[in-house]
């Protein structure tokens, strides 16, 4: 895990996204990137809470990521779901499959849940979210140092083996913002949505 660096966060532009309050939010999701294990040297489980306002801006509300057992991360995510009044939990199921949802249902059978499966690489999945940041459409409530450090170190040539860790917090962030803001318009596929966001970013549009 990279050390906290205020200078690094300033240079990569994350500080410019920081806010001290949020407007009325129309949707809130809790996103989970479950780790494959829970041992001392296992990756952490990413748990990120993000909201969306009526103007199409996203607000990163909390980072609850950490090294958990499956039951522990399910409890942490559901506690965040209740605390923030979220309307859905979104979880990657590449590691664990149906057991991810089953673990959550064991803690609270009534939560709204969406399973997502990664079919593209981490960098490719993050590109449309990076475009949202470039457009100034994503804001961080207060300081989220460990998430922001991961964001600043997550370049196009990121290599997990070289870095010595998985960008679990960034993965969860990407799933949350994709669920809220990377939504295809009618008749538009997800790749067309990605291209549309990239074009808006290049043109400086909303």
Regions found by a protein language model. Give the residues of each.
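Conserved beta-strand -> loop -> alpha-helix junction used to position metal-binding or nucleic-acid-contacting
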Residues: 110-132
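RNase H-like, metal-dependent nuclease domains and their acidic two-metal-ion catalytic environment used
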Residues: 1-116, 138-206
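Short, surface-exposed amphipathic charged segments that create phosphate/polyanion-binding patches used
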Residues: 125-136, 153-157
């Amino acid at each position: 895990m990279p050390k906290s660096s205020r200078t690094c966060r300033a240079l990569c532009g994350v500080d410019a996204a920081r806010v001290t309050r949020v407007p009325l939010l129309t949707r809130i999701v809790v996103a989970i990137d479950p780790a494959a294990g829970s041992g001392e040297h296992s990756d952490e489980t990413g748990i990120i809470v993000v909201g969306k306002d009526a103007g199409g801006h996203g607000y990163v509300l909390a980072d609850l990521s950490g090294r958990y057992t499956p039951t522990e991360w399910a409890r942490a995510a559901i506690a965040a779901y209740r605390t923030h009044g979220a309307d859905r939990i979104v979880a990657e199921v590449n590691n664990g499959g149906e057991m991810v949802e089953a673990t959550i249902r064991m803690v609270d059978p009534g939560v709204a849940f969406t399973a997502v499966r990664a079919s593209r690489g981490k960098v490719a999945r993050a590109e449309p979210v990076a475009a949202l940041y470039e457009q100034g459409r994503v804001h961080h409530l207060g300081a989220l140092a460990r998430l922001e450090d991961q964001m600043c170190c997550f370049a196009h040539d990121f290599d997990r083996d070289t870095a010595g860790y998985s960008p679990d917090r960034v993965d969860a962030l990407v799933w949350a913002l994709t669920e809220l803001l990377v939504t295809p318009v009618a008749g538009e596929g997800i790749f067309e949505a990605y291209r549309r966001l990239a074009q808006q970013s290049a043109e400086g549009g909303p």
